[in-house]
A protein has these predicted regions:
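Basic/polar N-terminal segments that are highly enriched at the extreme N-terminus
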Residues: 1-2, 144, 204
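Residue-level "edge-of-site" marker
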Residues: 34, 202-203
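Conserved residues at the C-terminal ends of beta-strands
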Residues: 59, 161, 201
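Non-transmembrane alpha-helical segments in soluble domains
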Residues: 71, 75, 95-98, 139, ...
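Short, hydrophobic secondary-structure boundary micro-motifs
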Residues: 81-86, 177, 196-201
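GST-like fold's C-terminal all-alpha helical module
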Residues: 101-187
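Charged phosphate-binding loop/patch that engages nucleotide di/tri-phosphates or the phosphate backbone
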Residues: 184-200
Length: 204
Protein backbone atom coordinates (compact mmCIF):
# COMPACT_ATOMS: atom_id res chain seq x y z
CA UNK A 1 0.00 0.00 0.00
CA UNK A 2 1.09 3.55 -0.67
CA UNK A 3 -1.01 5.75 1.58
CA UNK A 4 0.21 9.27 2.27
CA UNK A 5 -0.84 11.74 4.94
CA UNK A 6 -0.30 15.45 5.40
CA UNK A 7 0.86 15.84 8.96
CA UNK A 8 2.31 18.12 11.60
CA UNK A 9 4.59 16.53 14.20
CA UNK A 10 2.74 18.14 17.12
CA UNK A 11 -0.83 17.57 15.91
CA UNK A 12 -2.71 15.25 18.30
CA UNK A 13 -5.22 14.43 15.58
CA UNK A 14 -2.44 13.33 13.24
CA UNK A 15 -1.03 11.25 16.04
CA UNK A 16 -4.38 9.52 16.50
CA UNK A 17 -4.27 8.48 12.84
CA UNK A 18 -0.66 7.29 13.10
CA UNK A 19 -1.40 5.22 16.21
CA UNK A 20 -4.49 3.68 14.64
CA UNK A 21 -2.55 2.84 11.47
CA UNK A 22 0.26 1.22 13.45
CA UNK A 23 -2.17 -0.85 15.52
CA UNK A 24 -3.78 -2.09 12.31
CA UNK A 25 -0.43 -2.86 10.66
CA UNK A 26 -0.43 -0.05 8.09
CA UNK A 27 2.41 2.22 7.09
CA UNK A 28 1.91 5.60 5.46
CA UNK A 29 4.22 8.20 4.05
CA UNK A 30 4.23 11.42 6.06
CA UNK A 31 4.00 14.57 3.97
CA UNK A 32 5.15 17.64 5.89
CA UNK A 33 2.84 20.62 6.02
CA UNK A 34 2.77 24.13 7.42
CA UNK A 35 -0.84 23.82 8.57
CA UNK A 36 -1.80 26.82 10.68
CA UNK A 37 -5.17 28.24 11.73
CA UNK A 38 -4.23 31.72 10.51
CA UNK A 39 -1.82 31.32 7.58
CA UNK A 40 -2.99 28.21 5.79
CA UNK A 41 -0.72 25.90 3.82
CA UNK A 42 -2.01 26.28 0.28
CA UNK A 43 -0.56 22.91 -0.70
CA UNK A 44 -2.93 21.28 1.77
CA UNK A 45 -5.82 23.56 0.77
CA UNK A 46 -5.70 22.27 -2.81
CA UNK A 47 -6.76 18.82 -1.55
CA UNK A 48 -8.56 19.70 1.70
CA UNK A 49 -10.36 23.06 1.51
CA UNK A 50 -10.19 23.34 5.30
CA UNK A 51 -6.40 23.34 5.05
CA UNK A 52 -6.16 21.05 8.06
CA UNK A 53 -4.21 17.95 8.99
CA UNK A 54 -4.48 15.02 8.90
CA UNK A 55 -5.43 14.68 5.24
CA UNK A 56 -5.04 11.16 3.84
CA UNK A 57 -4.41 10.06 0.26
CA UNK A 58 -5.57 6.48 -0.25
CA UNK A 59 -4.20 3.93 -2.69
CA UNK A 60 -7.27 4.23 -4.88
CA UNK A 61 -7.16 8.01 -5.19
CA UNK A 62 -9.52 9.18 -2.46
CA UNK A 63 -8.68 12.13 -0.24
CA UNK A 64 -10.04 11.72 3.29
CA UNK A 65 -10.30 14.03 6.31
CA UNK A 66 -10.62 14.42 9.34
CA UNK A 67 -9.07 12.00 11.86
CA UNK A 68 -12.42 10.36 12.65
CA UNK A 69 -13.10 9.55 9.01
CA UNK A 70 -9.53 8.41 8.39
CA UNK A 71 -9.44 6.09 11.41
CA UNK A 72 -12.73 4.46 10.46
CA UNK A 73 -11.50 4.04 6.89
CA UNK A 74 -8.33 2.33 8.13
CA UNK A 75 -10.35 0.01 10.34
CA UNK A 76 -12.58 -0.95 7.41
CA UNK A 77 -9.50 -1.50 5.25
CA UNK A 78 -8.16 -3.89 7.88
CA UNK A 79 -11.36 -5.93 7.79
CA UNK A 80 -13.46 -3.98 10.26
CA UNK A 81 -14.45 -4.32 13.91
CA UNK A 82 -10.92 -4.01 15.27
CA UNK A 83 -10.92 -0.39 16.44
CA UNK A 84 -14.60 0.34 15.80
CA UNK A 85 -17.17 -2.16 17.10
CA UNK A 86 -19.70 -2.92 14.40
CA UNK A 87 -22.90 -2.27 16.32
CA UNK A 88 -24.65 -2.14 19.64
CA UNK A 89 -23.89 -0.46 22.94
CA UNK A 90 -20.16 -1.07 22.65
CA UNK A 91 -19.96 0.87 19.38
CA UNK A 92 -21.76 3.91 20.79
CA UNK A 93 -19.65 3.87 23.94
CA UNK A 94 -16.40 3.80 21.95
CA UNK A 95 -17.60 6.62 19.68
CA UNK A 96 -18.59 8.68 22.71
CA UNK A 97 -15.13 8.16 24.21
CA UNK A 98 -13.63 9.39 20.95
CA UNK A 99 -15.96 12.39 20.94
CA UNK A 100 -15.03 13.37 24.49
CA UNK A 101 -11.30 13.05 23.78
CA UNK A 102 -11.60 15.04 20.56
CA UNK A 103 -13.67 17.73 22.29
CA UNK A 104 -11.08 18.02 25.04
CA UNK A 105 -8.42 18.41 22.37
CA UNK A 106 -10.45 21.10 20.61
CA UNK A 107 -10.53 23.07 23.86
CA UNK A 108 -6.80 22.52 24.48
CA UNK A 109 -5.94 23.67 20.96
CA UNK A 110 -8.01 26.83 21.41
CA UNK A 111 -6.06 27.50 24.60
CA UNK A 112 -2.82 27.00 22.71
CA UNK A 113 -3.87 29.38 19.94
CA UNK A 114 -4.86 31.99 22.52
CA UNK A 115 -1.36 31.74 23.99
CA UNK A 116 0.78 31.76 20.85
CA UNK A 117 -1.27 33.33 18.04
CA UNK A 118 -3.43 36.05 19.56
CA UNK A 119 -1.44 39.26 20.27
CA UNK A 120 -0.72 39.61 23.98
CA UNK A 121 -2.68 42.83 24.37
CA UNK A 122 -5.77 41.01 23.05
CA UNK A 123 -5.48 37.98 25.34
CA UNK A 124 -8.97 37.12 26.62
CA UNK A 125 -8.65 35.43 30.00
CA UNK A 126 -12.35 34.46 30.38
CA UNK A 127 -12.12 32.57 27.07
CA UNK A 128 -8.98 30.76 28.21
CA UNK A 129 -10.59 29.89 31.53
CA UNK A 130 -13.70 28.57 29.80
CA UNK A 131 -11.65 26.24 27.60
CA UNK A 132 -9.65 25.02 30.60
CA UNK A 133 -12.89 24.21 32.40
CA UNK A 134 -13.87 21.98 29.46
CA UNK A 135 -10.56 20.16 29.75
CA UNK A 136 -10.92 19.78 33.51
CA UNK A 137 -14.47 18.42 33.43
CA UNK A 138 -13.46 16.02 30.63
CA UNK A 139 -10.57 14.73 32.73
CA UNK A 140 -12.93 14.19 35.65
CA UNK A 141 -15.20 12.09 33.46
CA UNK A 142 -12.27 10.11 32.03
CA UNK A 143 -11.05 9.39 35.56
CA UNK A 144 -14.45 7.90 36.33
CA UNK A 145 -14.33 5.81 33.16
CA UNK A 146 -10.70 4.71 33.46
CA UNK A 147 -11.32 1.52 35.50
CA UNK A 148 -13.20 0.17 32.50
CA UNK A 149 -10.43 0.82 29.97
CA UNK A 150 -8.46 -2.30 30.93
CA UNK A 151 -6.25 -3.44 28.07
CA UNK A 152 -8.62 -2.28 25.33
CA UNK A 153 -7.06 -0.90 22.15
CA UNK A 154 -9.78 0.77 20.13
CA UNK A 155 -10.78 4.17 18.83
CA UNK A 156 -11.86 5.25 22.30
CA UNK A 157 -8.64 4.45 24.13
CA UNK A 158 -6.43 5.61 21.24
CA UNK A 159 -8.22 8.98 21.15
CA UNK A 160 -7.97 9.39 24.91
CA UNK A 161 -4.27 8.51 25.01
CA UNK A 162 -3.44 10.98 22.24
CA UNK A 163 -5.39 13.71 24.03
CA UNK A 164 -3.52 13.11 27.28
CA UNK A 165 -0.19 13.10 25.44
CA UNK A 166 -1.03 16.52 24.01
CA UNK A 167 -1.76 17.87 27.48
CA UNK A 168 1.68 16.60 28.53
CA UNK A 169 3.22 18.39 25.56
CA UNK A 170 1.51 21.78 25.84
CA UNK A 171 0.02 22.07 29.32
CA UNK A 172 2.10 20.04 31.79
CA UNK A 173 1.56 22.76 34.39
CA UNK A 174 -2.13 21.86 34.58
CA UNK A 175 -1.23 18.57 36.27
CA UNK A 176 -3.75 16.22 34.68
CA UNK A 177 -1.92 13.28 36.29
CA UNK A 178 -3.56 14.04 39.62
CA UNK A 179 -6.30 11.85 38.14
CA UNK A 180 -4.47 8.81 39.47
CA UNK A 181 -6.47 5.99 37.87
CA UNK A 182 -6.35 7.67 34.48
CA UNK A 183 -2.62 8.36 34.84
CA UNK A 184 -1.87 4.73 35.73
CA UNK A 185 -3.79 3.52 32.69
CA UNK A 186 -2.01 6.03 30.45
CA UNK A 187 1.41 4.89 31.63
CA UNK A 188 0.61 1.39 30.41
CA UNK A 189 -1.00 2.46 27.15
CA UNK A 190 1.71 4.99 26.25
CA UNK A 191 4.31 2.21 26.38
CA UNK A 192 2.74 0.57 23.32
CA UNK A 193 4.94 0.57 20.23
CA UNK A 194 2.34 2.54 18.28
CA UNK A 195 2.51 5.36 20.84
CA UNK A 196 6.29 5.29 21.06
CA UNK A 197 6.72 5.49 17.28
CA UNK A 198 4.42 8.51 17.02
CA UNK A 199 5.68 10.42 20.04
CA UNK A 200 5.52 14.22 19.84
CA UNK A 201 8.87 16.01 19.62
CA UNK A 202 9.89 17.84 22.76
CA UNK A 203 8.74 21.49 22.77
CA UNK A 204 11.37 24.04 21.84
Amino acid sequence: MNMKVYYSPTSPFVRKVLVAAAELGFEMERLPSAANPVTRDQTVVTTNPLGKVPTLFTDDGMVLYDSRVICEYLDALAGGNRLFPAAGTERWERLTEQSLADGMLDAALLMRYEQVIRPGEMFFEPWQRGQLEKVTSSLDRLEAWAPGFGERVDIGTISIACALAYLDLRFPEEGWRRHATLAAWYERFSARESMQRSEHPLPA
